[in-house]
């Protein structure tokens, strides 16, 4: 007997996320901005990138702040500077953290395209409130 795919809506939605290509999955790696940044930029959430400064708000590293050292698009996790585990042989490995469990406190705007994106989103929010 051939094993078929599920028709349960929850499982179908879950499969869509995990079977999605990487360019779509990378769009799902978003985190909320801190209250100060939200007020300053007029944006509530943004894609997390290497170089952003984040505050971990959930889990065993709660309260830890550091720079994002890498983003694992395939697994949907980020690695934060200083949030590491010590293996049995003494080596340190980065602890994978889900982006929804962090708050972005400082954006890395060294990329002109990202700066442009922030400005564009800001204009959309401002024009949406006026109209």
Swiss-Prot record:
Keyword vocabulary terms for this entry: Ribonucleoprotein, Ribosomal protein, RNA-binding, rRNA-binding
Keyword rRNA-binding: yes
Gene Ontology CC terms, in alphabetical order: large ribosomal subunit
GO MF annotation terms: rRNA binding; structural constituent of ribosome
A Pfam family it matches: KOW
GO BP: any one term: translation
Functional summary from the UniProt entry: One of two assembly initiator proteins, it binds directly to the 5'-end of the 23S rRNA, where it nucleates assembly of the 50S subunit.
Name listed for the protein in its UniProt record: Large ribosomal subunit protein uL24
The organism of origin for this protein: Thermofilum pendens (strain DSM 2475 / Hrk 5)
């Amino acid at each position: 007997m051939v094993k078929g795919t599920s028709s349960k809506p929850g499982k179908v939605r879950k499969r869509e996320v995990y079977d999605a290509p990487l360019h779509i999955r990378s769009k799902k790696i978003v985190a909320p901005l801190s209250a100060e940044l939200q007020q300053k930029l007029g944006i509530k959430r943004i894609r997390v990138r290497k170089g952003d400064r984040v505050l971990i708000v959930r889990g065993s590293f709660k309260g830890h702040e550091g720079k994002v050292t890498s983003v694992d698009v395939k697994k949907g996790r980020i690695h934060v500077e200083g949030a590491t585990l010590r293996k049995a042989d003494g080596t340190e490995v980065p602890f994978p953290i889900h982006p929804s469990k962090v708050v972005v406190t400082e954006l890395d705007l060294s990329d002109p395209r990202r700066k442009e994106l922030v400005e564009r989103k800001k204009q959309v929010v401002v024009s949406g409130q006026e109209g």
